[in-house]
Amino acid sequence: MNCLRRGVTVKRKNISYYVVSVLLAAFLVACSGTKDTKNVETTTGEQEVSGEMIQSENSSEGFGENADTEHNASDKQDSTGQSSTTDETKEQPTEDETFSQPEIELIMVGDVLLHDRLEECAKQEDGSYRYEALFAPMKDEIQAADLAIVNQEVLIGGEELGITGYPCFNAPFTLGDALVDAGFDVVCHATNHTMDKQKRGLLSCINFWKTSYPHIGVLGMNETQEERDEIYIYEQEGIKVAILNYTYGTNGIKLPSDMPFAVNLLDEEKVVADIKKAEELADFTIVCPHWGTEYVLKQTKEQERWAKIFFDNGVDLVIGTHPHVIEPVEMMYDVTTGHKMLVYYSLGNFVNWSGESRDGVANRFLGGMAKVTISLDEGGNPMIADYGVIATVTHVEKKTNGVYTTRLSEYTQELSLTSEVIKQDDVFSKEYLEGVADKVWGELWE
């Protein structure tokens, strides 16, 4: 089995199917009648798409009829160890009748973007490059997730190709070591910088992952056509999740003539075919597109066009990257079919230190960690039970290991005054970043 793509069971737990819950649900539905979904209210209104009524909303609440599905039943006992009763006799469920809903806790972070300044801070006294400090404050949160995904913006081609920043990035293999140490399970490599070091860099990166960490899911770059055609499947709790990764382009660098499959591009015909295959193989489909316009805090019409393509073909979750700033989160659903899709248009940068000095630079140091809980509805079908976003900030100081990303909620105003970003954009502060998060995400973020 090719661990870069298909069906690697990273983590698996034992589950049962819920006979009692299903029977109870059927009884309740029969009693309550049919819900008129056309009367559902949303915060952003509704839009007509291809003759179907599509509603969208921005909210941190779980959605679906079974948004809160976890029920724990246990016998109450008195001091003698016997089951106690109330005035109203109730039959207690047996051990076989007591179940908990299976869940997959997923997180994803945005671009890991290593400019020259950041590489200088990662260089140690012995000349080696170490990146563990970048992720240390968020490591526990990353490792706590069942499925942790990162968008690796720059190529990891190794020191032999030279360690370079903008415009043609390349990082040493120790960056990959740090990503694995931090707890990431899946690495998205389809970005506009995937071909920065041409075919040699691409193959070097692929070989690193295959030989050093074959258990890590690496998406978006391919050594063979067979790899391009495979669908990565993550399975846990009996739920199969397909993850697809694409980029809008490669900065004008052509794919190798003998490797037209090298990078997953946003080609509609191929994307739709991939989604169809994913829908057949998995229960839940995620698309991670590298799309949009850099430094714009709102999605573009092109992003919305692609979101509709994903939605129309059955995708359940979209988590976008590339703009280097955060963008809105939107939930779309079809009131006729009941299909729902959650879209994070952009998570911004998870790690970066660009050298520009101008208005808007401060926005690039605010990022988001998407948090999504995938569970089962009463019919045993996968659903999004809950979702949200954690605001993050990259702190930068000119010293070894002086760059790291932490929760915005744990960042202090005093610490922000020591950030080098103030010299690039003097509006940078904790208060300013909180204002941007409020503007883009509303009450969704934490």
Regions found by a protein language model. Name each.
Residues 1, 39, 55-58, 75:
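Ser/Thr/Pro/Gly-rich low-complexity, intrinsically disordered segments
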Residues 1-9:
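Short, Lys/Arg-enriched N-terminal segments with co-localized hydrophobic residues
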Residues 8-19:
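Bacterial N-terminal signal peptides that target proteins for export
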Residues 21-25:
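Beta-rich carbohydrate-recognition modules and glycan-binding surfaces
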Residues 27-30:
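C-terminal motif of bacterial Sec signal peptides marking the signal peptidase cleavage site
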Residues 32-36, 45, 51, 63-64, ...:
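Acidic, metal/ion-coordinating pockets
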